[in-house]
Every structure is written in C-alpha cells, then in structure tokens.
Regions:
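Conserved class I S-adenosyl-L-methionine
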Residues: 2-61
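Class I SAM-dependent methyltransferase SAM/SAH-binding core
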Residues: 58, 65-106
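A short acidic, Gly/Pro-enriched loop at the edge of an enzyme's catalytic core
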Residues: 108-115
Length: 153
C-alpha cells in the first residue's frame, strides 16, 4: 500500500493481461482448489525450515487473495500482484491486509519477511532464465536472514 514500495514494470509475460478480464471469474474457475488445506501445507513447509509460529509472510502473485485469506489468521501478511482487477477483489476479501500492485520481478518493499511464497505456477509467466534468476534474487532481497521462499512450479 502507499509508500511501501516503488512499483515498476518487469518482464512478465504479456499474456498476463488475460487475468485482468478473468479476475471476476477467477475464484469460480478455481473453486475446486482447497485453499485452507494448501495453506496448512505451506505452513508445514515453513515450519520444517525453522519458521514456527507467527511469521511475516509475503505472497507474490497473490491474485484474489485466497491463500492470504487463511494465512492472515496466523501470520502478518502482505500480497503483491500485477493485476489491478485481481487486487480489487483481494482488497474486498482482505480489509486491512497490505496489497501492492507490482510486477514480481521488480517490486521493492521497504521491509523483509520470514516467508515469501509464489504459488499456482505464477513463476511460469517469466519469459527467460535471466528473468527467473532476477526474480528469485528479488525474493531473496525481501527475506529475513534464514527466511524461506516457497515457489510452486
């Protein structure tokens, strides 16, 4: 939200514009997903890497905020997404949760996190190996020492 970062543009796939038009249907299309259970698995992974208890959690490519809906119950959360329309839905779902419009490759927040997650194959929208390296470096920049990045291919 205001002042947390300098948004930029990055090398994500121009096909991401498809999500702008689909935003209002996105949750219905993905209704088959069990976000609560997936979130429990994410928390188990984070704990297995020594991140017990309440953590600062950044969800990159957060979409409509379905994982954040469960993560915020036990963690301090922030979401980043490149779609204004997805974030509009997420803001209705997640009042009070900071949500930032930015590209996963170039976002800059003024804080670090214990966990950075990037789920639902969002990383696959990057176009080159260099884009992937740069994006992972960006994730690392936003992690506290000993922090964990959880990326779903």
């Amino acid at each position: 939200m205001g002042g947390e970062m300098g948004a930029g543009t990055g090398p994500t796939d121009p096909g991401l514009s498809q999500f702008h038009g689909l935003a209002k249907y996105y949750d219905a299309i993905n209704d088959w997903k069990d976000y609560r259970r997936e979130t429990e698995r994410l928390e188990t992974i984070a704990r297995s890497f020594g991140r017990p208890g309440r953590t600062a959690w950044l969800d990159v490519a957060c979409g409509t905020g379905r994982h954040l809906e469960f993560l915020r119950r036990r963690h301090t959360t922030v979401g980043v997404d490149g779609s204004r329309e997805m974030l509009r839905i997420a803001r209705r779902r997640l009042p009070g949760v900071p949500l930032v419009l930015a590209d996963m490759h170039t976002f800059r927040l003024k804080r670090r996190f214990d966990v950075v997650s990037c789920l639902f194959s969002a990383i696959g929208h990057l176009r080159t190996k260099e884009d992937v390296r740069t994006t992972f470096a960006n994730f690392a920049r936003h992690l506290n020492p000993g922090g964990v990045a959880i990326v779903e291919p």
